[in-house]
């Protein structure tokens, strides 16, 4: 699905972020809301050879994997007017060209019981992507994250900021995949930090 197909005839658009977009959207938006989408789980299964790694040592970043009866929490950003075209151009380079993500339309459910869902655009990497890494053990993922760095910074920052977002913005939500990788990473780097 092309983003242009989603925005045709619309005056506003919601964009759902579940990885670095939750703390670093880097585009103008009217407002943002914390909430979730259904039918997807967040996994550190996608490679990153630009933002958080390189060709020799790709970092690990999140993508969404379809699964019934689960949800993924994040932030949806509403863009309006000229912000729609500007944000889609920017995100096309950031997520699609450099990250290999595809776009899909999903229902976003804002936190709170009395708010109806809104349609949102989300970027998802699939196993067809050449830099898709797929499943690995918690320890393998943490070890890879510990040593990778790209143009946007260290892969460690990506993981820790995402975990911090979940603790601060979604304190009642458990994300075992995310938090187990964070714990494994901290166990790996703690001796290095203490020795410094």
UniProtKB/Swiss-Prot annotation:
Reaction equations catalysed: glutathione = L-cysteinylglycine + 5-oxo-L-proline
Main location: cytoplasm
EC numbers for this chain: 4.3.2.7
Active site, per annotation: 95 (proton acceptor)
Keywords attached to this entry: Apoptosis, Cytoplasm, Golgi apparatus, Lyase, Neurogenesis, Notch signaling pathway, Unfolded protein response
GO cellular component: cytoplasm; cytosol; trans-Golgi network
Function: Catalyzes the cleavage of glutathione into 5-oxo-L-proline and a Cys-Gly dipeptide. Acts specifically on glutathione, but not on other gamma-glutamyl peptides. Glutathione depletion is an important factor for apoptosis initiation and execution. Acts as a pro-apoptotic component of the unfolded protein response pathway by mediating the pro-apoptotic effects of the ATF4-ATF3-DDIT3/CHOP cascade.
UniProt record similarity statement: Belongs to the gamma-glutamylcyclotransferase family. ChaC subfamily.
Cross-referenced PANTHER family: CATION TRANSPORT PROTEIN CHAC-RELATED, GLUTATHIONE-SPECIFIC GAMMA-GLUTAMYLCYCLOTRANSFERASE 1
Protein name: Glutathione-specific gamma-glutamylcyclotransferase 1
Organism, scientific name: Danio rerio (Zebrafish)
Gene name of the encoded protein: chac1
């Amino acid at each position: 699905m092309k983003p242009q197909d989603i925005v045709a005839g619309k005056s506003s658009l919601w964009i759902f972020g579940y990885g670095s977009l939750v703390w670093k959207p880097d585009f103008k938006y009217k407002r943002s809301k914390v909430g979730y989408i259904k039918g997807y789980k967040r996994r550190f299964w996608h490679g990153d050879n630009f933002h958080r790694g390189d060709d020799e040592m790709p970092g690990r970043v999140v993508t969404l994997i379809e699964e019934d009866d689960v949800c993924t929490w994040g932030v949806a950003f509403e863009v309006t007017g000229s912000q729609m075209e500007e944000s889609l151009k920017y995100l096309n380079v950031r997520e699609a060209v450099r990250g290999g993500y595809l776009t899909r339309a999903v229902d976003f459910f804002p936190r709170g019981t009395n708010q109806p869902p809104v349609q949102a655009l989300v970027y998802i990497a699939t196993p067809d992507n050449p830099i898709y890494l797929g499943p690995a053990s918690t320890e393998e993922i943490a070890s890879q994250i510990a040593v990778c760095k790209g143009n946007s910074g260290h892969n460690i920052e990506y993981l820790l900021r995402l975990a911090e977002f979940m603790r601060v913005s979604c304190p009642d939500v458990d994300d075992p995949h995310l938090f187990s990788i964070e714990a494994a990473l901290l166990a790996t780097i703690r001796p290095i930090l203490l020795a410094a």
